[in-house]
């Protein structure tokens, strides 16, 4: 993903993250509810208590192949701060991570934080799909991570993914459904397909 595309996504996500932090009623946050273009935003003075957001995911958060300041968490923090939000987005992305790998390191990552995050962006599953891992296994790993976050009373914004048609109808339907099913089960906020604007 190019830095310009990430900038577009980060401005869109800033709206979604604010909704998640503020605990709005609707648990599903469609990307189309945000600005459709990465138009320049006038800086607003940063105010209020710091909101710590943990971006936990794979290479899409780690920024594989990008300069550090071009990564998604960094762009998101910049977009939030330009909007006057005193946000700190902590990059906890690891390139190549599957949901199983994320499950193994989540508790350690949370324990390593100075203070409890105000929100976790949970973005995994793409590498499961690329490796043909069965959606039931991916779902079980997500459920374990959501259990961990629920026990720690940390709100979650689930960053949904979708499988392409060439994976077959059955796989596609099972994979795509797991995010919305988990969001309903755990009361998590959901972006149904957070990369949607990239593929429009």
Can you annotate each of these PLM segments?
Residues 1-19:
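Sec-dependent bacterial lipoprotein signal peptides
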Residues 17, 90, 157:
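Conserved Rossmann-like nucleotide-binding pocket used by diverse enzymes
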Residues 21-25:
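Bacterial signal peptide processing site
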Residues 28:
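Cys/His-rich zinc-coordinating "finger/knuckle" motifs
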Residues 31-95, 105-116:
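Serine-esterase "nucleophile elbow" of acetyl-processing enzymes
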Residues 60-67, 91-96, 127-133, 164-169:
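Second-shell loop/turn segments in exported
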Residues 85, 104-200:
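Alpha-helical cap/lid subdomain in secreted, periplasmic
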Residues 101:
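Active-site-proximal substrate-binding core of FAD-dependent oxidoreductases
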């Amino acid at each position: 993903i190019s830095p310009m595309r990430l900038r577009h996504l980060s401005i869109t996500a800033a709206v979604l993250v604010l909704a998640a932090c503020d605990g709005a009623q609707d648990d599903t946050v469609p990307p189309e509810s945000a600005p459709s273009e990465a138009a320049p935003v006038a800086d607003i003075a940063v105010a209020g208590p710091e909101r710590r957001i943990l971006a936990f995911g794979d290479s899409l958060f780690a920024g594989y192949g990008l300069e550090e300041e071009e990564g998604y968490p960094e762009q998101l923090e910049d977009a939030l701060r330009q909007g006057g939000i005193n946000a700190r987005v902590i990059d906890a992305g690891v390139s190549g991570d599957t949901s199983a790998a994320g499950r193994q390191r989540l508790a350690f990552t949370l324990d390593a934080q100075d203070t409890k995050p105000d929100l976790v962006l949970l973005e995994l599953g793409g590498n499961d799909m690329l490796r043909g891992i069965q959606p039931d296994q991916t779902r079980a790993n997500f459920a374990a991570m959501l259990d961990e976050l629920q026990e720690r009373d940390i709100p979650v914004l689930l960053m949904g993914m979708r499988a392409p048609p060439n994976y077959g109808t059955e796989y596609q339907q099972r994979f795509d459904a797991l995010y919305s099913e988990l969001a309903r089960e755990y009361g998590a906020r959901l972006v149904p397909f957070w990369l949607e604007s990239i593929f429009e």
